[in-house]
Amino acid sequence: MVRNKRVPHIRGTVEEAVRLARRWGADEVLARRAGILHDCTKYWELEPHLEVCDKYGVELDELERKAVKLLHSKSGACIAREVFGEPEEVFQAIFWHTTGKADMTLLEKILYIADYMEPCRKFDGVDYMRKLAYTDLDKAMLLGVNMTIEDMRERGVPIHANTLGAYNWLVEHGVTLEE
């Protein structure tokens, strides 16, 4: 299901998700399972993603129908639930780990952030995110969502409405990146 080069990222995401779950009082077993399966369909071609989403009743917007990078979270969540029997919490965490959304659960935030900052990730700001993730999870979320939005704008790529929704929700609930 995944390529060998992806294994270190998956392991890193699992380890980070478990550490974050322990820090924030979430279910470590569910965090581990979500981390293991979060990229299980990452390397599929477009058509299998669409088929799985259609089979399991996942409604896709126009942007998702064209973007494999967005689709892997939706199809991966379906495989986690329907093939591996994972519970709804794991399904939802995997489902939202790419775009984020407004009003995310603790497990959803943990997987989103663990995937973003696992030890193999190297980019400007990742060390600050790693610090924030253990002191203020919502600030870490805002940083990640903000970095995604900036990256998409710089590359001229459409920003998914759910990513903007995550950003707006956090800001509307008083989360800032100010010290």
Regions found by a protein language model. Give the residues of each.
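Divalent metal-dependent catalytic cores for phosphoryl transfer on phosphate-bearing substrates
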Residues: 1, 9, 23-143
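Charged phosphate-binding loop/patch that engages nucleotide di/tri-phosphates or the phosphate backbone
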Residues: 150-179
